[in-house]
Amino acid sequence: MKIAILSRDGTLYSCKRLREAAIQRGHLVEVLDPLSCYMNINPAASSIHYKGRKLPHFDAVIPRIGSAITFYGTAALRQFEMLGSYPLNESVAIARARDKLRSMQLLARQGIDLPVTGIAHSPDDTSDLIDMVGGAPLVVKLVEGTQGIGVVLAETRQAAESVIDAFRGLNAHILVQEYIKEAKGRDIRCLVVGDEVVAAIERRAKEGDFRSNLHRGGAASIACITEREREIALKAARTMALDVAGVDILRAERGPLVMEVNASPGLEGIEKTTGVDIAGKMIRWIERHATPEFCLKTGG
């Protein structure tokens, strides 16, 4: 097959691993910067051009689209879909997952347990918003934040009010969430490929922090997940219509709670921790689904 990887930086670990895994299985691979793609939208002859040339047909496209370029990145992916390329995660699913509020609403509607969460835009009554999630301690987030950026733990009511007031000054959407103290700065990242949790790690926050993101200096170890956690991870990925997802779970006293569903999970931390060839599993999933029947169905 001919496979395109949409990534702004082909030297990143995840992109390199996916390229290597595809080549090892005999596929032709090209890494494309989605921001350098430009499109002819025409009912008779739609096309995608890249750095002065018209791109050929790709059997499959692997999107590695960062949150900062979600709008144009998903537009480029959508054009590949229109031309009959199989997407490892559809553009609409990626856009949906990047919207934290919509994601939580969809997960809650499917009965998937979450931390108690409130969301507001410049709330007039900060006190009521805090009461909505059970009071302090609580976590205050910017809805648009990623990798632990724009996330603050407010240990007292006064601190929570101060943080919310500061975020209000940014004219931003504010997400307020109960703090799961018993998680002790740890969470479980389940990597879902298709209908299987292929790997799971426990991530631990660095000393003095409560955010377990590896990008923030957290540590990781192999996690043994329960059957309930496995079921929740798969259900969360299905709810978001993602074939590949990183599902983050907190272990609370009342049971596992889904924190987030990531549509473009990094592979470095989880592959190096578990030794699982996740990139290879992603390529094999593509091989099973990027079929001629798919191209006929989509018009490619």
UniProtKB/Swiss-Prot annotation:
Cofactor note: Binds 2 magnesium or manganese ions per subunit.
GO cellular component, as recorded: cytoplasm
Keyword set includes Manganese: yes
Residues reported in the UniProt entry to bind Mg(2+) 2: 260, 262
Keywords (A to Z) from UniProt: ATP-binding, Ligase, Magnesium, Manganese, Metal-binding, Nucleotide-binding, Protein biosynthesis
Pfam families per the UniProt record, alphabetical: RimK (PF08443), Rimk_N (PF18030)
Residues reported in the UniProt entry to bind ATP: 141, 178-179, 187, 211-213
Binding site for Mn(2+) 1: 248, 260
UniProt EC number: 6.3.2.-
Residues in coiled coil: none
Domain (ATP-grasp): residue spans on this chain: 104-287
Recorded family membership: Belongs to the RimK family.
Function as written in the Swiss-Prot or TrEMBL entry: An L-glutamate ligase that catalyzes the ATP-dependent post-translational addition of glutamate residues to the C-terminus of ribosomal protein bS6 (RpsF). Is also able to catalyze the synthesis of poly-alpha-glutamate in vitro, via ATP hydrolysis from unprotected glutamate as substrate. The number of glutamate residues added to either RpsF or to poly-alpha-glutamate changes with pH.
HAMAP family per record: RimK
Protein name, entry field: Ribosomal protein bS6--L-glutamate ligase
Species this chain originates from: Escherichia fergusonii (strain ATCC 35469 / DSM 13698 / CCUG 18766 / IAM 14443 / JCM 21226 / LMG 7866 / NBRC 102419 / NCTC 12128 / CDC 0568-73)
Gene that encodes it: rimK
